């Protein structure tokens, strides 16, 4: 018996992702000018308004509204008819200083003895069904949204009616052995200009999605994945018939409401903690990245076809409470899952500061994670430029920061040889 599994993604213009990108852009600015900044930034976006709240401990004071407007403009909310626009939307910042009770519990004389920023359990997952070790349903969903955004931003003549907000959903039919058999359903809802009757608009968008978007997505995959794109796929494109009112004007957006889109599309597990707006002292983020790094390297090293890793922490405590490994009965080594977990601890230091150091997390690398998934991305070195506008940063001689940073370090397969040696 085959079975169906579904994952979804959203575009960078989706209200919740707008909020995530604002929170992570603010985090990046703080870390760019003070690498030891402690940040927890939450964002609410709605019609013509952005509200920020959270806690910060930092040596710098930044022009938060200017950073927010820069993000909104970059996404593409630049027209008054969107009722959410970069230049005219109101911004309220309620960010205040981090509690001394929290910082007292985290900071230590020796940096490596730094305690966890909160309690909680975090999960990492990997599967060998795609080249980037994430579920195919999720990868396709992300690629649909990324390519639709690329068309909107860089080739608007192809689909000139596109607006920033969009969602995708892909259902894969699997064989009993968990190998993808076919693509069953593709759902895309994309915001658009009002250019005709509802019926004509839906028909035009459906045609363009199938004739322009889908061939581009298909071309990016290997032959075995391309073979899954057959004429039996069910397409639901803007199934309500019309999607003109969207973005934060259509739905309020909040930081941290797309945690399954951010991770594994419903596969594996999730501890419940969101990522965006949190500096790496928050193990919600850093330990989830570390667990993904472990899981991906285990699968790439051939330990198992599929791996789930759980770690947990207590606030202020340096070492994790536990590590749990599940290979779903697909292990390729003659060890129990508990024995695999023991060997993982021999290889990976899971103290919070050790994770920060290993994955280079004390760098302004976070805005790029805030749309199209934190996992399954391509590690790369980029140059980022930060230009503050005022306050104590503006008194510095180094007004403009140009930094080379490495993105998505937790996606690197840099422990495969070490794992193979220990598990041989």
Curated annotation (Swiss-Prot):
It comes from the Bacteria. Coiled coil: none annotated. Signal peptide: none annotated. Mg(2+) binds at residue 16. ATP binds at residues 14, 165-167, 242-243, 251, 257-258, 274, 278. It is found in: Cytoplasm. Its cofactor is Mg(2+); K(+). L-methionine binds at residues 55, 98, 251, 282. Keywords: ATP-binding, Cytoplasm, Magnesium, Metal-binding, Nucleotide-binding, One-carbon metabolism, Potassium, Transferase. GO terms for molecular function: ATP binding; magnesium ion binding; methionine adenosyltransferase activity. GO terms for biological process: one-carbon metabolic process; S-adenosylmethionine biosynthetic process. It catalyses: L-methionine + ATP + H2O = S-adenosyl-L-methionine + phosphate + diphosphate. Residues 98-108 are annotated as: Flexible loop. Belongs to the AdoMet synthase family. The gene is metK. This is S-adenosylmethionine synthase. Binds 2 divalent ions per subunit. Catalyzes the formation of S-adenosylmethionine (AdoMet) from methionine and ATP. The overall synthetic reaction is composed of two sequential steps, AdoMet formation and the subsequent tripolyphosphate hydrolysis which occurs prior to release of AdoMet from the enzyme. K(+) binds at residue 42.
